């Protein structure tokens, strides 16, 4: 990692502005597209293999019926209409013409290519679109789907968002993920090899049942070895109507405290490659469904806490990153 100091930053982290000590998504958007972009959540009505019985039933224990698409329109609304509505709403917060359609809800490659192709290609024709983001699972990337993603990556800035959550198979089984870490790495490597222009964003959850800080950071270390283009760090939310809510209400799950979460995020950032974009350092649970932790509603406070902790420790993203000499999954 370079130790060249960014002008006025007071620390040697290069991929940031405004004094940030990690590679923010906002910085990447400005560097890539020349300014802010609105990411438009969409629900295309797909299912998941751990919902329909292919590798399990009921989905992940923390997942609502919307499959991480709680902020998208209902799937019954046509995709273009979803896009236009959400674009109008987000324009009040981020007045920008640049937009990235985000196929977010559930597993968005869990269908034949004949179904996927027209959906994704149509999205590229919508007004203001400068890129495309597709959320899926690494075990839902057959060869013909990867070939389609490679085609799309030649036409636009494509981000494929892969849910991993944990590198520990015991935890993955407990939360009903329906795949192992080896499954994830196999899918990741094939995507990296066959669609080299596609950006890969890996999703991780901190605070999963049975995991302490050491276990969480071991997941981050393993992911850092893969050198993904982007990472999202999520706080585990307890949402009404989920299996996790039942566990929580029965006293079988204790959510992270804010200070614990901030400390874990700081240590996670230190382990990640400095070039990796940190697309999220916390998440949003639908307010009406959030049971715990209630402190997570104060998102700005959490973000400020992370910035303050990094500054207090005089540390930054990648400070403790140790690259492997060789790794078949690297670019």
Task: Please report, for each region that a protein language model flagged, where it lies by residue.
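N-terminal [4Fe-4S]-dependent radical SAM core
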Residues: 1-100
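Hydrophobic faces of well-ordered beta-strands that scaffold small-molecule active sites
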Residues: 38-42, 99-101, 132-134, 158-162, ...
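Active-site phosphate/pyrophosphate- and oxyanion-stabilizing loops and adjacent acidic/basic residues
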Residues: 27, 121, 147, 189, ...
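Long, charge-rich boundary regions
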Residues: 87-120
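Short, electropositive alpha-helical surface patch
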Residues: 117-122, 150, 211-229, 285-307
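Auxiliary Fe-S-binding modules of radical SAM enzymes
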Residues: 1-27, 36-38, 230, 238-331
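Conserved non-cysteine loop/helix-boundary elements of the Radical SAM core domain that shape
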Residues: 68-77, 105-118, 132-195, 206-227, ...
């Amino acid at each position: 990692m370079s130790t060249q100091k960014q002008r006025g930053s007071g620390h040697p982290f290069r991929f940031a502005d405004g004094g940030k000590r990690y590679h923010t998504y906002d910085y990447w958007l400005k560097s890539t597209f020349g300014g802010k972009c609105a990411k438009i959540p969409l629900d295309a009505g797909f299912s998941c293999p751990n919902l329909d019985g292919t590798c399990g039933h009921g989905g992940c224990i923390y997942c609502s019926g919307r499959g991480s698409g709680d902020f998208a329109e209902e799937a019954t609304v046509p995709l273009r209409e979803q896009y236009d509505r959400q674009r109008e709403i987000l324009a009040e917060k981020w007045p920008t013409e640049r937009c990235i359609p985000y196929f977010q809800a559930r597993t968005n490659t869990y269908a034949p290519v004949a179904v996927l192709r027209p959906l994704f290609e149509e999205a590229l024709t919508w007004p203001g679109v400068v890129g495309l983001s597709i959320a899926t699972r690494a075990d839902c990337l057959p060869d013909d789907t990867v070939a389609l993603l490679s085609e799309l990556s030649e036409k636009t800035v494509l981000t494929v968002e892969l849910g991993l959550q944990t590198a520990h198979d015991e935890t993955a089984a407990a939360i009903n993920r329906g795949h192992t870490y080896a499954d994830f790495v196999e899918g990741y490597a094939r995507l990296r090899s066959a669609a080299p222009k596609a950006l890969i964003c890996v999703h991780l959850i901190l605070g999963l049942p049975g995991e302490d800080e050491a276990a969480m950071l071991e997941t981050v270390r393993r992911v850092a070895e893969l050198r993904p283009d982007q990472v999202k760090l999520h706080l585990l939310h307890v949402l009404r109507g989920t299996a996790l809510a039942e566990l929580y209400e029965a006293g079988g799950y204790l959510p992270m405290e804010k200070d614990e979460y901030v400390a874990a995020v700081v240590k996670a950032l230190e382990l990640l490659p400095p070039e990796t974009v940190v697309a999220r350092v916390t998440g949003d649970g639908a307010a009406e469904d959030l049971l715990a932790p209630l402190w997570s509603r104060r998102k700005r406070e959490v973000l400020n806490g992370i910035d303050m902790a990094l500054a207090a420790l005089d540390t930054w993203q990648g400070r403790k990153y140790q690259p492997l000499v060789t790794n078949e999954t690297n670019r």
